[in-house]
């Protein structure tokens, strides 16, 4: 790889081919030399962006990708809540983070941003009406393999910060927007409900955010965030019932909406996950872990990100319209 010019900062984005990653890369490419480390080839990277094909679990590939790099955005992770081999969550999300931190420390990078998730902020015993980055949750409170792996990854970042490693942590909420085929859990949820004439739903509070605001927030956290601190990158709190109504208005599609209690949702998720694990080997429509997170969910505060970073997310309606427009017409005709 040719070294970056001395006047231009070389930046590595792991997971740069993903939903958030592609928007972050597009933003960074305006004034950085950007390199992507990902197993997937980027679908729409700006001209001049370098691509290294590989896994964050491969130390040799990671060292190659870190050549001449000054800043690292670590986004690479398995984002869904169901995969055939559950141990992959721990390997990619937790061990992959450790590999990246160890290699970046040896490289001597100036700053490292670890992209975590809001899902680990919802504890089983929390009595706070609003959740913020100050919340303290434990590994035992995590409802499944995904959240456990993400909590362990964040703990690795915090432990590294405690020993002087220049790492900042960002906790995005549920990003939506134009996805170009990157069907992340929030976008899959929108598609799931949009195509159904009868919508059975567990009502809960979620926080939706424009994916472009997440990208901008990651850059702000890298530039202005305090080492060893968390920053929640969210947008608007909205109930699923309200979201379904807004989606119906935007899409012009009528649907019968049927709320279901938490106990029924949990039983349905157990059955769906059993068949996914044992029979279909295909992601179920609901998982036990996702239902548990929904039942614990509360409004999220982004005041620290506003105050310390200058983070200013836009209203979510435009992103919601774009996300709906990105759903293939063949799916919407179901």
Regions inferred by a protein language model and the residue ranges of each:
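Catalytic helix-loop patch of NAD(P)-dependent Rossmann-fold dehydrogenases
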Residues: 95, 126-169, 174, 198
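Conserved Rossmann-fold NAD(P)-dependent oxidoreductase catalytic core, especially the SDR/UDP-sugar
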Residues: 99-145
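NAD(P)-dependent short-chain dehydrogenase/reductase
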Residues: 163-169, 173-207
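Mid/C-terminal beta-alpha module of Rossmann-like enzyme folds, strongest
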Residues: 217-284, 302, 318-334
């Amino acid at each position: 790889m040719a070294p970056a010019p001395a006047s231009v900062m070389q930046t590595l984005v792991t997971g740069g081919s993903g939903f958030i990653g592609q928007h972050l890369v597009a933003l960074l490419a305006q004034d950085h030399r950007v390199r992507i480390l990902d197993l997937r080839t980027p679908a729409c990277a700006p001209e001049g962006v370098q691509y290294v094909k590989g896994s964050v679990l491969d130390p040799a590939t990671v060292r190659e990708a870190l050549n001449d790099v000054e800043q690292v955005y670590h986004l690479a992770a398995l984002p869904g809540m169901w995969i055939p081999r559950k141990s992959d969550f721990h390997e990619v999300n937790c061990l992959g983070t450790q590999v990246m931190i160890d290699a970046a420390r040896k490289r001597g990078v100036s700053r490292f941003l670890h992209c975590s998730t809001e899902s680990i902020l919802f504890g089983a015993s929390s009595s706070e009406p609003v959740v913020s980055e100050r919340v303290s949750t434990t590994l035992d409170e995590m409802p499944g393999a995904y959240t456990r792996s993400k909590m362990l990854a964040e703990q690795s970042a915090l432990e590294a910060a405690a020993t002087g490693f220049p790492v900042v942590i960002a906790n995005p909420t549920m990003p939506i927007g134009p996805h170009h085929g990157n069907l992340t859990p929030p976008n899959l949820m929108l598609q799931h409900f949009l195509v159904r004439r009868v919508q059975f739903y567990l009502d809960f509070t979620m926080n939706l955010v424009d994916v472009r605001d997440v990208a901008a927030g990651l850059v702000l956290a890298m530039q202005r965030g305090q080492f060893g601190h968390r920053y929640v990158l969210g947008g608007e709190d909205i109930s699923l019932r309200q979201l379904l109504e807004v989606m119906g208005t935007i899409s012009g599609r009528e649907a019968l909406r049927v709320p279901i209690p938490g106990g029924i949702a949990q039983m349905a998720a157990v059955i769906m996950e059993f068949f996914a694990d044992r029979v279909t080997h295909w992601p179920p429509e609901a998982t036990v872990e996702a239902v548990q997170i929904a039942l614990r969910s509360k409004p999220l505060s982004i005041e620290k990100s506003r105050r310390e970073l200058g983070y200013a997310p836009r209203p979510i309606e435009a992103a919601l319209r774009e996300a709906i427009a990105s759903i293939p017409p063949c799916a919407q005709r179901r």
